[in-house]
Amino acid sequence: MRILLAWFSQSPGTENLISALKDAGHEVVYWVGGGDDRKIKIPGTIVHTHNAARNGLPAPGIDTSKFYPPEEALIKQLYETESLVLTMMNKRFDWMCVDERKHTYYNTLQYWNGVMNQYCPNVVIFSVVPHAPFSYIIYGLARLMNIKIILFDTISRVGVPDSDRILMSLGSWESSSPLLEALEKNKGKNFSLEDLSKDLQQYYKLHTANYSGDPTPLCIKEDKDKYSGFRLAALKAKMVAGSIKDFTIFEKTLAYIQKLFRKNIKQEYVSLQSEPDFARKFIYVPLHYQPECSTSPQGGIFVDQILMIEVLSASISNDWLIYVKEHPVQWLFRGLNFFSSRYRGYYKRMSKLKNVKLMPIEADSYALIRHSQAVATVIGSAGFEAILRSKPVIIFGHPWYQYCHAVFRVGGVESCKEVFQKIVNGFSVDQQKIINYLKAFDDVSVQGFAAISQPMAERLKKSGREEMQNIIETLLPELVKYS
């Protein structure tokens, strides 16, 4: 098989993966995502760094003179891809206007369409759900050209150190056929908690009512620690030193002073927030951090989280409320300036909707889940944490737990009203079915290791090659089916 590999070089053992693929008789014609920090040369393989691809630069040695601008027909066939890619640009190209983003998209499409036609891969393999503009264009082209797609979705067990799970999907990130097959195979069987791997047992116990541990995700704890106290001071000192070095200190100081007198996203949010009333019936909606993969592409049209809340608002009865809470690290990572994913008036639009209340960002998310009648999310981990607490979940995207009992996917007001009525009528969560689902998930996912922040990254160096071996052992048998 001729393989285009979209795999980040930060993943330990990636070169082992390429060697394993070649030893199995496959040809890795193109590797994008590799070699950011090292000059890697692999005979017979084009190596394209992630940074170069992200910035629209071609791989070394690629002749682009015959990579022509995309045809109108191709652009029309990829309208959905284009729509999502434009939102992905909020991360690195927030400063671009819509017209510049569209032209950048056309240029990127031109390059990758040329690559696909020149190197003719039979299979495209992604290390993650594609969520960079260039990688999602590769994904869109592969689907259009009927090229086989294999991708791996990392599901973070971030409340349990060193225990990510990696789930393989075939053909689309929207569903996992291996997981569906495992569910069908286990149909009619009941499993106990002891039948699960130890990491999933611990995860389950961590989020059930009679367990005393702290369920706060490890990544959230580490991120808050990184942006507080001495570490925050050190980070700011480093930024100041860098600004002095590149002579931008005066420009940035002026911009900072001006910012002090302008309204920011936190001020807008705080001016609209209110305390929760647990005596009322409500649906809890924890917002996703944006821009990120969890909403673009995995949320589809509901990358617009206001649209999600509008659907909920139009679907519930007047005596119910919707409690919305911002993601705990949204302002830490992106700062307090308005930007494309949190524009001026963003929170105001939400708060004006019928029965919608904004909760303080420091409000206890687990208390909100516990006192709610249901939780609604695009694909957030709060959804699965809710069903472990026997709360039904409304989802708008395609998370790994989408096939689980007590999870209801909706796409608009009509389907949302039907789900709301089930909840009103007293829908009950069956924990046995949750354990059965985890067993199927356990059977088809492979052990991974977290690499979200620096302490985790250090652990990853020790265990990443074991993770890669797990992936290789899952991937190679699947490729045999395609041969």
How should these model regions be labeled?
Residues 117, 276-277, 367-368:
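Structural alpha-helical scaffold elements that stabilize or flank donor/cofactor-binding regions
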Residues 340-359:
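Nucleotide-activated donor-binding/catalytic signature segment of Leloir-type glycosyltransferases, i.e.
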Residues 13-26, 311-319:
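A short, Lys/Arg-enriched amphipathic alpha-helix followed by its capping loop at the start of a domain
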Residues 233-343:
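Conserved catalytic-core segment of nucleotide-activated headgroup transferases in glycan assembly
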Residues 20-113, 117-118, 157-254:
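Conserved N-terminal ligand/cofactor-binding loop architecture of enzyme catalytic domains
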